[in-house]
């Protein structure tokens, strides 16, 4: 597995009104590398991610795309033995999966997903070409929650306390899954916020925990449509974010009966959808 951080010596520039100072100092940056995802021999997509928890990421991505519903549908997940770098070592940047739908009548629509998945660490709307497609994905049923505001305001700080890679680099997002009692069950960090969410959801999927009723997806980023949709596909009834919520995220949360809050900072937040306890 590749490194998740890289150490550099970089010029540090300080500019004042009268003089510019330049000093060399050590810096730690987050690693971003491609992960090529192959499903049943088909090159589905290449996503830019922070190495680590790759199999969780892919499970979460396949769930979000509607290609799987249960971890048992992924019969094999392995790194490609032929993916080697200039040093003749395995780069662990090509992941091959064998997927067999639990329902034999359900076909894997790899072509439409493959055609539209972009190559990015902020992958955005994955595998879709229209608003109708965005809204048509069917995940686990949502059972609404009524979270306590006093619990909600504690979650960003709890998430921040577990952002070890951010402490070192300042360059990654974090996602966490919390119970309604405010316990963080799992936290993942990545250069892409969507990757972080996929890793969290993929972890729970691989441990047989779906649907994720009575939980909240906690994000260190803004609350975009894609994150709300990923949560909905996993049956997560609530999303909170330290940043803003987008219009489509709000509309989607309201239509799905989900709870959504943004700008959760200090003792305040904006309440966009759902009911409070």
From Swiss-Prot:
Gene Ontology terms: biological process: Mo-molybdopterin cofactor biosynthetic process
Subcellular location: Cytoplasm
Record carries keyword Transmembrane helix: no
Residues binding Mo-bis(molybdopterin guanine dinucleotide), per UniProt: 263-268
Coiled coil spans: none
Record keywords: Cytoplasm, Molybdenum cofactor biosynthesis
GO cellular component, one term: cytoplasm
HAMAP family for this protein: FdhD
Primary role: Required for formate dehydrogenase (FDH) activity. Acts as a sulfur carrier protein that transfers sulfur from IscS to the molybdenum cofactor prior to its insertion into FDH.
Protein name: Sulfur carrier protein FdhD
Organism field: Corynebacterium efficiens (strain DSM 44549 / YS-314 / AJ 12310 / JCM 11189 / NBRC 100395)
């Amino acid at each position: 597995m590749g490194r998740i951080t890289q150490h550099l010596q970089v010029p540090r520039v300080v500019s004042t009104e009268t003089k510019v100072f330049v000093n060399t100092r050590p810096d730690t940056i987050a690693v971003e590398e491609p992960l090529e995802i192959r499903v049943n021999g088909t090159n589905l997509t290449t996503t830019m991610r922070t190495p680590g928890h790759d199999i969780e990421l892919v499970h979460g991505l396949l769930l979000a795309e509607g290609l799987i519903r249960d971890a048992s549908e992924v019969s094999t997940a392995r790194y490609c033995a032929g993916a080697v770098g200039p040093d003749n070592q395995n780069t662990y940047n090509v992941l091959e999966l064998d997927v067999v739908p639990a329902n034999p009548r359900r076909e894997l629509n790899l072509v439409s997903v493959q055609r539209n998945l972009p190559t990015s660490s902020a992958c955005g709307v994955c595998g879709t070409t229209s608003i109708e497609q965005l809204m048509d994905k069917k995940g686990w049923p949502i059972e609404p929650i009524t979270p306590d505001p006093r619990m909600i305001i504690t979650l960003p700080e709890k998430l921040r306390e577990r952002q070890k890679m951010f402490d070192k680099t300042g360059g990654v997002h974090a996602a966490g899954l919390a119970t309604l009692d405010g316990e963080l069950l799992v936290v993942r960090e990545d250069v892409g916020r969507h990757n972080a969410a996929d890793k969290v959801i993929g972890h729970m999927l691989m441990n047989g925990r779906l649907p994720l009723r009575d939980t909240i997806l906690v994000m260190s980023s803004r609350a975009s449509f894609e994150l709300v949709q990923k949560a909905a596909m996993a049956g997560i009834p609530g999303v909170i974010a330290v940043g803003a919520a987008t219009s489509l995220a709000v509309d989607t949360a309201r239509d799905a009966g989900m709870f959504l809050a943004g700008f959760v900072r200090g003792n305040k937040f904006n309440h966009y959808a759902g009911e409070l306890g």
